[in-house]
Amino acid sequence: MIQINKLRKVYDNGHEALKSINLEMNEGELVCLLGPSGCGKTTILNLLAGLLDPTSGDIKFNDISVIDKHPKDRNIGLVFQNYALYPHMTVLENVMFPLTVGNKKMPKSEAMEIAKKYMKITSIEELANKKPGQMSGGQQQRVAITRALVQNPKILLLDEPLSNLDARLRLKIREEIRRLVKEIGITTIFVTHDQEEALSISDRIVLMNEGVVQQFDIPQNLYLEPTNLFVAQFMGNPIINIFEMNKEDNILKGEHFDIDLNLLLKDRFKSELTEEKYIVGIRPEYFITSENHLFKTKIETVELIGKDCIVNFNVNGVYAKSITDVNQNIRENDEVGFDIDYNGIYLFQENGVRVY
């Protein structure tokens, strides 16, 4: 178990990278730290690894504080974006290396036996005699992960390990990472800025922005039940459609369409709607083409994404997107009528707090 309590990090230039972070991660759990550049996710990873010292707060592994422990004494495995393999060594020698130096040094024969065991688990046995320059990026990544695991760490820390790989290989390797860490049962923290990676690989996701945890939840809840406007806008591709509307009695009025509040589910309201203005969020898949439409508009561009299309249109100066079936054969400059599936509506106060 990893416990992070009131963790702050302020750099010498006064920048507060982390603002009193509180997190608890369970043993054997795969947790992604997700967010835009500069949000603090890598800072947390470096603090967990002992590569940075916190300004205040505490970090505990299994109820024992590690704040004052050297990185080598924290029993962690760390894999960076750059694989950091020794170019003059073979794969077997690279994997064995952590077992032949420092306080974990053991006889060469024993180190080789352990290395081969983990190389079998990660399916890199056939690469044993190759050097890094003779391998693909995906193969090098497997070697780097194996080298981290061979030390039998309690915690595995992965810092954007897939960012140097092409899209198809990223998909393959992330599946392998998920399988591997679950097979071994190791607690894993995975840093990424890619929401698709986080959604597909995680047990839970920590979504961060400006040094603050915005939501710590299971993947589907970040998409379906965002806590605030930032989460709703960050999660989802295409991005959620946003409209500013005015409340008049039980109607939210917009330029091209209105939202009847009486049609919303009462148990989804998180507070009473007492303000005059609200931000309405509608996921693209909930803008549906319909003859009995709320509004009609001209399609500006169409993006083909396999069996679906992303159609882009303008709602009185606000650009919006809908996902439609490619067989609808919608083309640029077509006049198309849209309705709204109320299951895909979210309401936010102007400060970003979600109220529905």
Protein language model regions, located:
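Short coil-to-beta microelement around the adenine-binding A-loop and adjacent beta1/P-loop entry
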Residues: 14-16
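ABC ATPase nucleotide-binding domains
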Residues: 74-77, 81, 85-230
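Non-catalytic connector elements of ABC transporters
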Residues: 240, 251-356
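Conserved ABC transporter NBD signature motif
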Residues: 57-65
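The feature captures the beta-strand-to-loop junction immediately N-terminal to the Walker
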Residues: 34-36
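Helix-to-loop junction immediately C-terminal to a conserved catalytic motif
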Residues: 49
